Structure formats: structure tokens, C-alpha cells
Swiss-Prot record:
It comes from Irkut virus. It is a single-pass type I membrane protein. It comes from the Viruses. Belongs to the lyssavirus glycoprotein family. GO terms for cellular component: membrane; viral envelope; virion membrane. Glycosylated and palmitoylated by host. Glycosylation is crucial for glycoprotein export at the cell surface. The lineage of its organism: Viruses, Riboviria, Orthornavirae, Negarnaviricota, Haploviricotina. InterPro entries: PH_Rhabdo_glycop, Rhabdo_glycop_CD, Rhabdo_glycop_FD. This is Glycoprotein. Residues 481-524 are intravirion. The gene is G.
Length: 524
């Protein structure tokens, strides 16, 4: 099978089989056979719309995935954590103030979070001031508690958005998924009970910058939409398409895995959860342009073969493979029966595995049954080999498997959830560590003596207190001295008489009359 055939079969398919790519086209409806002259041979024009006779073309604009679009949509946002800082102060008798800081949390509201985020992004000093610890108040011999609420903003905080349903994914969300859904709520809850995640842009649709407007032509028959010719000139059938919204935009997923913002009156079913879309990257765009070039080239090769047949007046079954319809849709099939050229109307479909048309040895399934052969010749160059195997010329192409692998590599899912049950954002016990990195320290502080007075009043009070203490000390000393004097015992009357002193005739002092008397009698 040529490279063109593989690409064409991939881009134009009419039946769905998950996980496989089309590799060939074969009639699902064929016959009856009728003899023709070689002059009636014609090459199929695969660029023309021939699917079910839908030949009416109308110009229109449509949306498709932007070229270069990456698989995951990144949404910028920020987290908002409500923090209450509590300052507890106690002033003792001598004026020492002890301050102890404690930290608690509260669940913030969305409007306050957006206001704080605006302050931070604008460089408003009010945001930094709001994070400072509260200025502690104090009263003598009292415990005073001062609280201050702050909103801690951490940005950027980038999450992944699923383009299919706008679901947000991040390991910071419970179970890795935003809840409540961002379409129903302006915020997402996180693994930290007091932290909210909000998108930087309130309108999440602004994050879905993945579409581009293209021009094409609708193919209709009697007002019924069959398919369209895209901007690159390729016809795409709507057979087997299913409804799918990307970033809230309604559209259809075609059977080749592409997405287009088309809708039909006879709306198809919604796509199953596993039906993803192809990434529209530069490589796939190059393939699309390459297909158009190859279609033209293959038509030229077919015309060259037709010219050779008409010139030589001879034909072989191998040359008939050039006249096969390369894309699903209406066409013709050719064969040789009893050395007579035969033609039949046919409707081609795509297949993804060879066993779909070769279910068993010697059986070529076409039109819902094993198609009969005539002297080992089926049609379109397909023959029965000497050992009874069905031989298809395109099966021998060395480029086929390489191109199938190339097509498979371009089928990349959009869904990239970051949910990891083992990676919890923060547990309750780690909440302090979460906010302490971004807020001032809350260690215990003890101030100097502070009675709450201004500077001059404090020194005045100290001076007055010193004078008062000095005066009080003097008063206490005087009072103590007087008190001690009053406590001495008074002498009796006899002791007073005994202690009276007299002076003798000799001029000596005699302590008492009795002493004088005793001294006088003792003299000779």
C-alpha cells in the first residue's frame, strides 16, 4: 500500500473501531458487473465530493484546533489562605511585657481573595502590611489578646484543564480534581481546608485559546449535510461522527480523530468518554498538505497508466489497482473476467485491519460476503496466490507499517490529570509549615520594662519614685529610732535615792549618803 493510500485511508473513514487506523479501502457495496471497453476506463478524482451524491458545495467558516496546539491546557491561578495571627501579651508588676504569638486559620471568601490578589499583583503596600504580625496591646497586670486576619496569596499556581469538559486537575485538589466544578463555582477547594484555588481570570473560557477560524465548503444533498471540504482541500465525511464539546464549544469528532465546529440537524450521539481527538500540530498539518499533493500525483500516475493501456491496447490485473477509490465514498471497481474488462458501481469503506477483509484463507470479504474470484482474480488488482492466499498489492508496501506507526504517534490524548493519591498537598498538622514560609516569625517575645507611658513621663515617674523612696527611707529610720527610745525601762524611787551623788568634805564625789556614812565611820 502506498504512503498516499495509508494517509488517505486515515483521513477519510466511515466506520469506527477504537484504537486502530484505516489502512485500506474496499467496496462494501459492489455490482453488478458489466463489460466495458478500455476506452471507458476512468481514474477516480479523490478530491471531488462523491460521498452519497453530496455534490452541492457551499462556502462556510468553521472552527478547528489551532496548529501547534499542545495537549494540556495550562490555567494560571493562585491560592488564597486565610490566616489569623493572635498576639497575647501579659504585663507583670514591674512592667515586663511578655508577647506570645499564635496562628490559626479561617476559610476566606472569594471577593476578599481577589482583592488581595489585585493588591499583590499591583504592588500595593497594603498587601505586605496585611501580612505583618499585629501590634500587641498591653495593660499593667493584665493579659491582652490582639488578633489580625491576613490573606496569604501564592502565585502563580498552574493547573491543567481538560479541554473536553473544562475540568481542572492538580495534585493540590482533593483526589486530584477540582471540586466543586469550576463551571459551577468561582473557586476550587484544596487539600488544605482553609486554602482556595482561584483562576487569575474570572472567565475561564479565556484560557481556551486553542481554536482557529478556517474556511471550507459544506457538501450537502437535498439540504442534508454529508461532509465538508476543509481549508486544505480535503473532503471529510461526517459518517460515524459524534458530538463533542471542547472548552464549551459544540462540535463533532470525526472518525479520523479530528474535531470541527459543525452541527447537523440529525444530531449524532455524544462521544463516549474514551473518544479523544487528535492533536493538530505542525506535523499533522504537513501531512494534510502532503496528502493533497499526493492525491494529485496519484491521479497523474493513474492517467499515465490509462494512457499506457490505451496505447498498448492491453491491460493486466495489476494495473487495475491504480483505478481503486482511495477514500471512502462512491466510486467504481474493475476486474477481468474471461479476459474481458468488467466494471461495477461500488461504495468504498475503510478498514483498519487486514483480517476485516481476509477473515480466513482464500476469502476476500466484500459486500458482506466472501467475494467470488474468476480464475484467481478478484478486482482492483487483488488475486488469489498459488498457495490459496489472498494477495493485495498494497499489503506488500514497505511504507505502510512505517506510516501506520507515524499516525499512531500523532494520536495523543488531551487528558493529563495530575491526580496522585500519594501526594497530598498539606495535612492538617502541616498547615503551620505551609504558611510559616510566607509569614513573619511568631516566636515568643519579652520586652523591657514598659508601663505604657511616653518617654519623658517615664523618666519623670522614675525620678519621683526615687525621691519618694529616699524620703520614705528617712522617715522610716527616724521613726525606728524614736520607737527604740520609747521602749527603754524607767528606774524605781529607791534606785533613784541610791544613785544620788554627793560631794564629801575632802572634795571627792561620793555616790550616795550611805557610802559617805560608811567612809566617815571608817576613819580613825
Amino acid at each position: 500500500m502506498s504512503l498516499l493510500t495509508a494517509v488517505i485511508a486515515f483521513l477519510f473513514i466511515s466506520t469506527f473501531c477504537s484504537g486502530k487506523f484505516p489502512i485500506y479501502t474496499i467496496p462494501d457495496k459492489i455490482g453488478p458487473w458489466s463489460p466495458i471497453d478500455i476506452n471507458h476506463l476512468s481514474c477516480p478524482n479523490n478530491l471531488e465530493v462523491e460521498d452519497e451524491g453530496c455534490t452541492t458545495l457551499t462556502a462556510f467558516n468553521y472552527m478547528e484546533l489551532k496548529v501547534g496546539y499542545i495537549t494540556s491546557i495550562k490555567v494560571d491561578g493562585f491560592t488564597c489562605t486565610g490566616v489569623v495571627t493572635e498576639a497575647e501579651t501579659y504585663t507583670n508588676f514591674v512592667g515586663y511585657v511578655t508577647t506570645t504569638f499564635k496562628r490559626k486559620h479561617f476559610r476566606p471568601n472569594v471577593s476578599a481573595c481577589r482583592a488581595a490578589f489585585s493588591w499583590k499583583t499591583a504592588g500595593d503596600p497594603r498587601y505586605e502590611e496585611s501580612l505583618h504580625n499585629p501590634y500587641p496591646d498591653s495593660h499593667w497586670l493584665r493579659t491582652v489578646t490582639t488578633t489580625k486576619e491576613s490573606l496569604l496569596i501564592i502565585s502563580p499556581s498552574v493547573v491543567d484543564m481538560d479541554a473536553y469538559d473544562k475540568t481542572l486537575y492538580s495534585k493540590m485538589f482533593p483526589n486530584g480534581k477540582c471540586f466543586p466544578p469550576i463551571s459551577d463555582s468561582p473557586f476550587c477547594s484544596t487539600n488544605h481546608d482553609y486554602t482556595l484555588w482561584l483562576p487569575e481570570k474570572e472567565k475561564l473560557s479565556m484560557s481556551c485559546n486553542i481554536f482557529v477560524s478556517s474556511k471550507g465548503k459544506k457538501a450537502t444533498k437535498d439540504g442534508r449535510l454529508c461532509g465538508f471540504v476543509d481549508e486544505r482541500g480535503l473532503y471529510k465525511s461526517l459518517k460515524g461522527a459524534c458530538k463533542l464539546k471542547l472548552c464549551g464549544m459544540a462540535g463533532m469528532r470525526l472518525m479520523d480523530g479530528s474535531w470541527v465546529s459543525l452541527q447537523r440537524a440529525d444530531a449524532p450521539e455524544w462521544c463516549p468518554p474514551g473518544a479523544l481527538v487528535n492533536v493538530h500540530d505542525f506535523h499533522s498539518d504537513e501531512i494534510a498538505h502532503f496528502v493533497v499533493e499526493e492525491l494529485i500525483k496519484k491521479r497523474e500516475e493513474c492517467l499515465d497508466t490509462l494512457e499506457t493501456i490505451l496505447t498498448t491496447k492491453s491491460i493486466s490485473f495489476r494495473r487495475l489497482s491504480h483505478f481503486r477509490k482511495l477514500v471512502p465514498g462512491l466510486g467504481k471497481a474493475y476486474t477481468l473476467i474471461n479476459n474481458t474488462l468488467m466494471e461495477a458501481e461500488a461504495h468504498y469503506k475503510s478498514i483498519r485491519e487486514w483480517k476485516e477483509i481476509i477473515p480466513s484463507k482464500g476469502c476476500l470479504k466484500a459486500g458482506g460476503r466472501c467475494h467470488p474470484h474468476y480464475d484467481g482474480i478478484f478486482f482492483n488488482g487483488i488475486i488469489l496466490g498459488p498457495n490459496g492466499d489472498v494477495l493485495i498489492p498494497e499489503m506488500q508496501s514497505s511504507l505502510l507499517q512505517q506510516h501506520i506507526e507515524l499516525l499512531e504517534s500523532s494520536m495523543i490524548p488531551l487528558r493529563h490529570p495530575l491526580a496522585d493519591s500519594s501526594a497530598i498537598f498539606r495535612s492538617d498538622n502541616e498547615a503551620e509549615d505551609f504558611v510559616d514560609v510566607h509569614l513573619p516569625d511568631t516566636q515568643k517575645q519579652v520586652s523591657d520594662i514598659d508601663l505604657g507611658f511616653p518617654e519623658w513621663k517615664r523618666y519623670f515617674l522614675i525620678g519621683v519614685s526615687a525621691i519618694a523612696l529616699f524620703s520614705l527611707a528617712i522617715i522610716i529610720a527616724v521613726c525606728c529610732r524614736k520607737f527604740k527610745r520609747r521602749k527603754r525601762p524607767k528606774p524605781g524611787p529607791i534606785e533613784l535615792v541610791r544613785k544620788v551623788s554627793v560631794t564629801s568634805q575632802s572634795g571627792k564625789v561620793v555616790p550616795s549618803w550611805e557610802s559617805y556614812k560608811e567612809g566617815a565611820t571608817s576613819q580613825p
